[in-house]
């Protein structure tokens, strides 16, 4: 009963609380320095079998858990020059640039929006990256990240899939209920998509990750990783 009351209390804040985003980590906006090229993290804790460079893409979003939107055939993203700056308004961490989306979107539209920006939804390759970027999200709201546990994979995999390879083991991030169990963290046949909540409180445990229905209108975080984008050429 205590758990249910907690969720019921949090959900209204999803749409009723309005606050300007603040940051506890100083990340420079487009600094003029090129994102450095580095090999993808090879993590022995990778939770699922490596399938392709993408662990999932827009073609996987055509199930009943996602909103019904059209996905035109996609071409490989345009070449990103290694001497290029992060675009205006983007944040930099290591070899990636990040966009904090201020429009409320369903998960599938958020993924398409990131693709149109030559990026993916945010995929954390380390706990340092996770902690640095999630605090940049809009305060007192949830933001979509590139982490999904698809209904059609549930019998094969307990852990959710990051959108791209080489990512942090998802059990390491700040789930609401630990140790990580999908059902205890909101997962269901319709709630396949993970979102990160940025609490206005300075208390670290007040911010967390939770599964929500993929049709919910949330903010989102895009990541343009120079290694990933250029490897897809």
Curated annotation (Swiss-Prot):
Signal peptide interval: 1-19
Keywords: Disulfide bond, Glycoprotein, Lectin, Proteoglycan, Signal
Any one Gene Ontology molecular-function term assigned to this protein's record: pattern recognition receptor activity
One Gene Ontology cellular component: external side of plasma membrane
GO BP: immune response
Disulfide bonds listed in the record: 114-222, 193-214
Annotated C-type lectin domain residues: 93-223
PANTHER family, per the entry: CD209 ANTIGEN-LIKE PROTEIN C-LIKE, KILLER CELL LECTIN-LIKE RECEPTOR SUBFAMILY F MEMBER 2
Official protein name in the record: C-type lectin domain-containing protein 87
């Amino acid at each position: 009963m205590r758990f249910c009351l907690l969720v019921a209390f949090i959900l209204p804040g999803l749409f009723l609380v309005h606050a300007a985003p603040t940051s506890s980590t100083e990340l420079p906006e487009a600094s003029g320095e090129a994102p450095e090229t580095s090999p993808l993290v090879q993590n022995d804790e990778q939770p699922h079998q490596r399938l392709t460079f993408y662990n999932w893409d827009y073609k996987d979003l055509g199930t009943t858990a996602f909103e019904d939107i059209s996905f035109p055939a996609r071409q490989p993203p345009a070449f990103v020059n290694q001497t290029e700056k992060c675009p205006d308004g983007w944040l930099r961490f290591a070899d990636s640039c990040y966009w904090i989306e201020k429009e409320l979107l369903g998960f599938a539209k958020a993924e398409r929006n990131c693709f149109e920006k030559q990026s993916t939804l945010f995929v954390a390759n380390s706990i340092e990256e996770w902690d640095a970027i999630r605090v940049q999200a809009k305060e007192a709201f949830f933001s979509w990240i590139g982490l999904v546990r698809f209904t059609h994979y549930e019998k094969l995999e307990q852990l959710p899939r990051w959108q791209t390879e080489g990512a942090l083991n998802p059990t390491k991030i700040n789930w609401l209920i630990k140790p990580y169990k999908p059902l205890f963290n909101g997962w269901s046949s319709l709630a396949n998509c993970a979102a990160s909540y940025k609490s206005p409180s300075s208390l670290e445990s007040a911010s967390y990750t939770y599964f929500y229905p993929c049709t919910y209108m949330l903010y989102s975080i895009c990541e343009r990783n120079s290694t990933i984008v250029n490897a897809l050429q």
